[in-house]
Amino acid sequence: MRTLMIEPLTKEAFAPFGDVIETDGSDHFMINNGSTMRFHKLATVETAKPEDNAIISIFRADALDMPLTVCMLERHPLGSQAFIPLLGNPFLIVVAPLGDAPVSGLVRAFVTNGRQGINYHRGVWHHPVLTIEKRDDFLVVDRSGTGNNCDEHFFEEDERLILAPHQ
């Protein structure tokens, strides 16, 4: 099994998979009589159908045991999905490019700095949320509507990957 190299999350490296939601290096303008900086349109919510809705939820995630064997990835073909950390903790991201199925050799891993969120583009393969802390909270912006919006792909045993953030 291949061990994933964990990269620091940057806008450039993550661009094939989605958006990095952060203020560092992002354009802004002043509002509210000059008392507030607005970092505008850091990500776009994607939905497949006009009758779909963008919704906001909170996910409370428990940490998985590490090192983790990455056995599966999922994708949301009908909408984007954003994760914004509420407690300021770094978290892990495992992604693969768009396609009918994820290719094990193209899977990448990232770690946030705790002040970054991410927005997976519609159809991007990714691992379910991976917190480093024992428990963590995330603001999630995604799609509500009819139709199946979660495809799962389970890797064959020889395609599985190892995620070991502390090695």
From Swiss-Prot:
SUPFAM superfamilies: RmlC-like cupins. It holds the Pfam family Ureidogly_lyase. It catalyses: (S)-ureidoglycolate = urea + glyoxylate. Coiled coil: none annotated. One of its GO terms (molecular function) is ureidoglycolate lyase activity. Its EC number is 4.3.2.3. GO terms for biological process: allantoin catabolic process; purine nucleobase catabolic process. Its cofactor is Ni(2+). Keywords: Lyase, Purine metabolism. PANTHER family: UREIDOGLYCOLATE HYDROLASE, UREIDOGLYCOLATE LYASE. Homodimer. This is Ureidoglycolate lyase. The lineage of its organism: Bacteria, Pseudomonadati, Pseudomonadota, Gammaproteobacteria, Pseudomonadales.
